[in-house]
Amino acid sequence: MARWAPEETDTMAAIAAEAIAQVGTNRTVIGVDGQDGTDLERVAAALVTGFEQHGISAMAAAAPSADQDRLRSDLVTPFRTSGAGDGVLIVHGRGILAHGVRTLWRWSLWVEQESGRLERRADVKIAASAVLDVTDPEHPRREWNDAC
């Protein structure tokens, strides 16, 4: 018997609500990183839709690199200084939750799938605000990376 699982739109709206509750939406920048083989662009686009379901203006941008200075100058600073009021920028790319880069994000999401899953206490997973399993992309699951 097949198990019920929430649709992608429902999961991403719930993740957006979690981010809203934790860090707010006043020019908030979110980082989305993940293991090889995950579609970070799809996840970022779905998260934009999740924020929009809550009435929050959001947009996604691909990271030009995982270099902290370049990310700050090309994406983070222009977003934070060019507008006023609520708005969320979701930056997606490999390596953007690495040590030294992760401090750019007010909230972050690590994306993985069953094959190649990182250990529960892997540094990048510990640093992420949330973990998303996209083994079934139509029904992604929020994972709880706790030690309980």
What are these regions (language model features)?
Residues 23-25, 81-86, 102-103, 125-126:
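Flexible, charged surface loops at secondary-structure boundaries
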Residues 27-31, 87-90:
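Residue-level preference for the first positions of well-ordered beta-strands
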Residues 33-37, 63-65, 92-94, 112-113, ...:
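Structural motif
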